[in-house]
UniProtKB/Swiss-Prot annotation:
Lineage, uppermost ranks: Eukaryota, Viridiplantae, Streptophyta, Embryophyta, Tracheophyta
Disulfide bonds: none
GO cellular component: cyclin-dependent protein kinase holoenzyme complex; cytoplasm; nucleus
SMART domains per the UniProt record, alphabetical: CYCLIN, Cyclin_C
Protein's recorded name: Putative cyclin-F3-1
SUPFAM superfamilies registered for this protein in UniProt: Cyclin-like
UniProt feature, compositional bias: Low complexity: 19-43
One GO BP: cell division
Entry similarity comment: Belongs to the cyclin family. Cyclin F subfamily.
Length: 389
């Protein structure tokens, strides 16, 4: 009873939450028999919402009810608010706690002062003879053992493997470049072309992909015709004959730059143009005719044909043309200069596009490429043929 008297004295002193520790243990039996106390009673409550830890199986600790002594979780409590206008970090677009509005990519902003230097460097690399395949390597080096039809079949198979492994377009373009440059330096048996194509994809994936497939995957894609040891040995041969120059610019390298320069944005029309240009660039890999052109010329031709195919009533070079041409050309002569340089490339690319896409004959299996998810976004019912005039 002395403990009860002490509790009453405490209540009178202005402590409505009661006492803890020994005072709880000393509650008289008759006081407990009267039933649980109210939350603001002088002695500790036995209910889960009291100031003491709950005895329910699911309770993890002190009660979270708003009327207990613990911190409140209601929005108007002292804790940080989650309302948009509160000071505790708003998620609304205009709030100071982190805007959701799109902002320019920091990497893109950082590279702006060096765009012309990068362009000049890439164009110097693509023109180096050590990084270029021979135009007539089939006759000069291979001696007719490998013809261009066989090359087309090989490239087509490589495109299929790249699709199976979900490789980037850059990886496929690098791999085809490795094959052409390798065959320009050494006579190679035709019955091992699949080993060469597989290994070229393996080397390119190491250079371009974040998570390249394992060598076992490339061995398995040949139905285990070639072992992992043979693929690894072929990898060393390719790197040795290429002098380890595996980072040469390709058509995709310049095409990405051209699309960014003259067609920036993410709207649907620009997306269609990107898909069309990528598709034309892949088609150009199949034909040996395009080996003679610099990658930047083929990329410009793909952009020209792609823009004209999607918008036949517009002039393809209108809009930011000067940004994709050599810096020494004045704006007035840009259009004539570029069209004259890519004329021969542009002249045959539409016919290749028409034949390969809507014909079941030939070595290409580009019906498979059309099944790719991105090509399904690009329906073209009546493609426009670009005449020589």
């Amino acid at each position: 009873m002395e403990a009860a008297a002490a509790a009453a004295a405490e209540e009178e002193a202005g402590n409505p939450d009661g006492v803890e520790g020994a005072a709880v243990a000393a509650v008289a039996p008759e006081a407990a028999a009267e039933g649980p106390s109210e939350p603001n009673a002088g002695e500790a409550s036995r209910e889960p919402d009291a100031g003491q830890a709950s005895r329910e199986p699911g309770a993890a600790g002190p009660s979270r009810e708003p009327d207990v002594a613990g911190p409140s979780r209601e929005p108007d409590a002292a804790g940080p608010s989650r309302e948009p206008g509160a000071a505790g970090g708003s998620r609304e677009p205009g709030a100071a706690g982190g805007s959701r509005q799109p902002v320019p990519d920091a990497a893109q902003l950082a590279v702006v002062p060096y765009v012309e230097d990068i362009d000049r460097y890439l164009r110097s690399l693509e023109a180096e003879q050590t990084r270029r395949p021979m135009i007539n390597y089939v006759q000069e080096i291979q001696g007719g053992i490998i013809n261009m039809d066989v090359r087309g079949i090989l490239v087509d198979w490589m495109a299929d493997v790249a699709y199976v492994f979900n490789l980037q377009e850059e990886t496929l373009h690098h791999a085809v470049s490795y094959v052409d440059r390798f065959l320009s330096k050494i006579a190679f048996p035709g019955d091992k072309l699949k080993l060469l194509g597989t290994t070229a994809l393996f080397v390119a994936s190491k250079y371009e992909e974040i998570h390249p497939p394992h060598v076992r995957n490339f061995s398995a894609v040949t139905v285990n015709t070639y072992t992992t040891q043979q693929v690894s040995k072929m990898e060393l041969d390719i790197l040795r004959f290429l002098n380890f120059d595996v980072g040469s610019p390709t058509v995709i390298t310049f095409l990405r730059k051209f699309l960014t320069s003259c067609c920036g944005g993410n709207n649907s029309s620009n997306r269609k143009l990107e898909l069309m240009c990528n598709y034309l660039a892949e088609l150009s890999l199949l034909d040996d005719y395009y080996i003679r052109f610099l990658p930047s010329i083929v990329a410009a031709a793909c952009l020209f044909v792609g823009k004209f195919t999607l918008n036949p009533n517009t002039r393809p070079w209108f809009g930011s043309v000067s940004t994709i041409t050599p810096p020494e050309n004045i704006k007035g002569g840009v259009e004539k200069y570029m069209v004259s340089r890519i004329y021969m490339c542009v002249f045959d690319l539409p016919m290749l596009f028409l034949m390969e896409t809507w014909s079941s004959s030939g070595v290409s299996n580009h019906t498979k490429l059309q099944l790719k998810q991105n090509m399904m976004e690009l329906p073209i019912e009546n493609p426009t043929f670009i005449s020589a005039s």
